[in-house]
Amino acid sequence: MKSTSKRTFYPGDEWLYFKLYTGIKTADDILIRSVFPVVKKLMREEIITKFFFLRYSDPDFHIRFRVLVKNPKDLGYILYTVNQKLQRACKNAQIYRIQVDTYNRELERYGKDHIEFSESIFSADSECVLSILKILCKKDENYRWMVALKMIDCLFNDFGLSLTEKASYIEKMSLGFKQEYGFDLSLIHI
């Protein structure tokens, strides 16, 4: 299905959007044991073509999980498959609420001509992060931030940024993050 620069996708449209309410500490387990396997299955079956997730609070912490459906006739199958895969986490009270919601694309942030490309990057990034999380779950917690920094550096290298450009970009992103989320560095004691 073509979704060029369309802003809003309601449940039943080509983007299916789940909110999985969970704890911050259980999120990785849900991503590794539930989300990743169901995504791999649906991709292998060619039922979905893209997916991505992000962690969010509104104010309750949850995983926002979106899939691009190849054919709307498969929506029932997708809902059933996701439901079956999430049952263990629900029964163990790792997930305490699941919502299917409306996906509103951030066209102002990513651009109407670039949103589909951005979603492809989100999908590739989500798949990469899930693969790494699967490996890191068996490692010391310190590996997590080291791997994150290495991934950021590799991405910067892919864009050919110099050390000065990397530092400038990180500073700009840091300021944007602080403004958007009200982050106060004075609260952190290092």
What would you call each of these model-derived segments?
Residues 21, 25, 37-43, 47-58, ...:
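Internal, hydrophobic cores of structured domains that mediate oligomerization or house catalytic pockets
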Residues 188-190:
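Conserved small/polar residues in nucleotide/adenosyl-binding loops
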